[in-house]
Amino acid sequence: MRIQSTLFGTIPLTLALALAGCAPLVTQSPGGKLSPVNAVAMDGNDRVILKGADVVAYFTQNAYKQGNPAIKSTYENVTFYFSSAENKALFDKEPTRYLPEFGGYCANGIVYAIPWGGDADTWRMLDGKLYIFGGAGSRDAFLLDVPRNRQLADKYWNEEVKGSNAFTQRTLRTTVNRVAHYKSGAELAAEVAAAKK
C-alpha cells in the first residue's frame, strides 16, 4: 500500500494532530475566576478539578479522598467531586473556602511562574489553605522556605498565571523566559537532600 502525501492530504492531517493537543487547553481554561485550573475531562464532565479528589475532605478530615462522580457540584465552570453528600453541602454553602491555592497546580511550580499539574495525593494544609504539589520532591522543596515560596507563588500567580492559558505560560516559562531564581529539578532535589542531613 502506498501513501501519497499531497497538499490537501497533509493539511487536514496536520490540523487534526495540532487540534488533538487542544483538549487540555480548553479543559484547563474554563474562564471566570478559576482560570487556569488543574482539571481533566473525565466521566463525561469537561473540567473535573484534581482528577476528582474531594477538596472538602482535605479541610474537614485532613485527608486525601477520591470523590464520587455521582456526588458533584459545578462552580465557575469547574466540576468538583465529593466523597459524601455532607462534603458537597459544605462546598455548596461556601465554595471559595475549599478551593485549592493556585488553581490546584503544583505550588512549587507556581514559585517559578510555571503551572505544572499537581497530584491530589501530594498536598499540605498551611494556615488553613490547601496547597497541591507535583510530587514529594516538589512539596519538600516548597517547605524549605515557606514564607519566601508563598510570596513568590502569590506574586507569579496574581501577576502572570491567573487568567492566562496554562499551556502557553508553561511553555514560555520552561523554555525561553525563565524567572531569575529558576532551579532545575536536580538542583531542588540536592537542596532538599542537604536540608535532610
Labelled PLM ranges:
Residues 1-12:
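Bacterial N-terminal signal peptides that target proteins for export
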Residues 72-90:
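Beta-strand cores of secreted/periplasmic/IMS beta-sandwich domains, seen most often
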Residues 18-21:
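C-terminal motif of bacterial Sec signal peptides marking the signal peptidase cleavage site
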Residues 23-76, 96-197:
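Intrinsically disordered, low-complexity terminal tails and linkers in eukaryotic proteins, enriched
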Residues 14-16:
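Extended, charged alpha-helical coiled-coil scaffolds
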